């Protein structure tokens, strides 16, 4: 895929970029290796000072950075601003807490003194997606740099200006120029990079296919990976739930970022007692969402990020309908320039159809009727994915049942699934391995060194 900025709201090419050659990649790897030797020895207060400076830049320049994001991948401008603000909060969170998360952990043994000591391991390769082009990077970079590691970013080919802007933020904040670098490279150049002995570990957020390929290469080299992959997340509503809030949140959970989110709700399991009423309200709200210019404050749904994604979503809808799914609203590309798709609702979706089995990365909801919590859990778990789940009920017994029985890395009760710097983020099954964020996230790329003093 060519490295280029294309405005998804218009289809206009904004700027093209040439991939780095081997010599430039080598120069940056040497720079990262050198920077690590210095950065790993910096004190936590010094690293925190630098990261707070990044947060300050993010807050000061949030509208300019948000504009770049919206132009490159079509996110609603107000959501882009919120994403930049979230990045700043993530930086401040790790600046305040990293030292505590990585304190030595004493152990009671037969030794005179024994403890666990955390040490950074070196340059980490981060392969990141376009859908949250700043936040996905910062939720890796903030803990990694606070831990004493250095970062090398291979960003998605359609957001090169976001990638370069992030690199400049770290440089301008005072980090060594090798502490965080962007590599403008093509997908075919990634394998050689992973194999390079100077790369000590790899983190990837992306598709199941990409995760499998990257994970296989890293495994051959015996390198640690964190993989955050796809999801087909369930959204369950029981009769005791706050009905109005559940409906409005369901619409938001399916259409956030135009449905292009790994933890967006995609399959909706509604209790039989409230199904008809829920479906009526849900379809009505989906149908009336305003689709259009992401810079318009009244717009609720922007474009999909690329024409390839648009075509893929439409193909999944068509195949699901051919398999027997019934279309209640939407189901078509919107005529005119840009990559816009109608908010879509499907019912009577067969289990062998794409809308049930695959991740649909667009504003397409599959709604199912269930008899009871047990059937909701069975259908929710009938997936190769297990990223997040949202369950709506005010029954304490049902809340405990969903929390314990849903096969996912995260369960949200009476709330929409979302990432938070204070909590670990990640999935099970084919949704990935490892965790980002929280204390777990910062420890993923550390040498947990056992110290025994006899």
Tell me the role of every PLM-derived stretch.
Residues 14, 209-350, 379, 413:
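ALDH superfamily catalytic-core signature
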Residues 1-113:
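N-terminal Rossmann-like NAD(P)+-binding subdomain of aldehyde/semialdehyde dehydrogenases
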Residues 11, 32, 47, 69, ...:
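Residue-level signal for inorganic ion chemistry
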Residues 59, 103, 107-245, 370:
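Rossmann-like NAD(P) dinucleotide-binding subdomain of oxidoreductase/dehydrogenase enzymes
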Residues 15-20, 35-41, 126, 235-237, ...:
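Short, well-ordered beta-strand elements within core beta-sheets of diverse protein domains
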Residues 36, 40, 55-62, 66, ...:
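Structural signal for hydrophobic packing residues in well-ordered secondary-structure cores
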Residues 150-152, 327, 410:
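A short hydrophobic/small-residue beta-strand
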Residues 10-16, 199, 236, 290, ...:
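Conserved C-terminal structural/oligomerization subdomain of aldehyde/semialdehyde dehydrogenase
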